[in-house]
A protein has these predicted regions:
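Active-site acidic catalytic loop and adjacent metal/ATP-binding pocket
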Residues: 1-8, 15-16, 50, 154-201
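ATP-binding pocket architecture of kinase catalytic cores
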Residues: 9-112
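Activation segment
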Residues: 21, 80, 186, 194-196, ...
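A cross-family kinase active-site recognition segment
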Residues: 54, 86-142, 166, 271
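A glycine-centered beta->alpha junction motif in the catalytic cores
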Residues: 56, 68, 72-86, 127-137, ...
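ATP/Mg2+ or Mg2+-diphosphate-binding catalytic cores
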Residues: 135-136, 253-301
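Active-site activation/catalytic loop segments of kinase-like enzymes and analogous catalytic loops
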Residues: 200-233, 247-265
């Protein structure tokens, strides 16, 4: 995808997004309908709504010089500061994130779309698809740690996921997709990984990024989960799979990075969280989380 910021005058700004012609139209339609549905629920934060063209379509076919046909769409621009740019994330910010994710998931509880029933490389419910990449990790100690993370996901998450509540989730709520104003979440962007999943995978994806680099990763997780729980109460079964889901997401992040390094080891955007992912995996392994330890007591939520 290629994105351009469009200044339309009088303070109006939009994002002009060009996508490959091979992007399934059903996925784009799903994103449009999902955002419209969620935005109608008065979330308290903004979503990047897609504007229709003069023909009433959400995409327009274009042809760039020397390129094949592409498709483009115009999206509302949300003015805010990326959470990723914050060097110090406060407890208030983490609680705002937990509430925002819960509000978003509640807004989608009565929404479904056939295109969301899919698999992709970042699908946390299928983290095991990347286990074959273990051989890409040359350091034996790191390879063993990564295998431990996959094993934990297989043993303590995979068998239980089918019985947990399912719905369409955002599935990619990390710092580059969360917009802030002060200490409050004001926007959620990038719906390219939305899929029908166990709802708890929303937290399973987001928590690792909020725990990475934090002096007290357990408290960071507790802040987000407790705020989420107040809006959309979690079951004990959902909480029980959080640690293995976090390990699964970290394993996927590391595995995809290892695969990408074989393609372009100098890419500026592919490896930003890799080192911190290893550090958090070490922390979880060294502190008994593979032996049944939980991030928090359910009673403390």
């Amino acid at each position: 995808n290629i994105n351009f910021l469009v200044n339309a005058g009088q303070g109006d700004r939009f994002v002009f997004k060009i996508v490959d012609k091979d992007m399934p139209p059903a996925i784009v339609a799903m994103e449009y309908e999902l955002i419209e549905h969620a935005a109608s629920k008065d979330l308290g934060f903004k979503l990047p709504r897609i504007l229709k063209n003069r023909q009433g379509e959400i995409e327009t076919r274009i042809k760039l010089r020397k390129n094949a046909e592409n498709r483009a769409r115009l999206i509302e621009f949300i003015d805010g500061c990326l959470l990723e740019s914050r060097s110090d994330i406060s407890q208030k910010t983490r609680k705002s994130l937990g509430k925002a994710l819960a509000d978003f998931d509640l807004a989608l509880q009565d929404f479904d779309h056939s295109a969301a029933h899919r698999n992709h490389r970042w699908n946390l419910a299928d983290a095991g698809q990347h286990r074959s990449k273990l051989s890409l990790i040359e350091d034996p100690a790191k390879r063993d740690l990564l295998a431990w993370a996959f094993d934990l996901w297989v043993a303590r998450a995979k068998p239980l996921l089918a019985e947990l509540p399912h719905q369409i989730i955002h599935g990619d709520a990390h710092g580059e997709n969360i917009l802030m104003q002060g200490e409050s979440v004001i926007g959620l962007v990038d719906f390219g990984d939305c899929c029908f999943n166990p709802t708890i995978c929303e937290l399973g994806v987001s928590l690792p990024y909020m725990m990475m680099g934090n002096a007290d990763p357990e408290q960071a997780a507790m802040d987000i989960v407790s705020a989420y729980h107040r809006i959309r109460p979690l079951s004990r079964a959902e909480c029980a799979v959080l640690v293995p889901l976090i390990c699964g997401r970290l394993a996927v992040t590391i595995s995809v990075a290892a695969e990408r390094r074989r393609i372009d080891s100098d890419h500026p955007n592919w490896f930003g969280s890799e080192d911190e992912a290893w550090e958090l995996l070490h922390y979880l392994s060294d502190n008994g989380f593979g032996k049944g330890k939980e991030l928090f007591r359910y009673e403390d939520l």
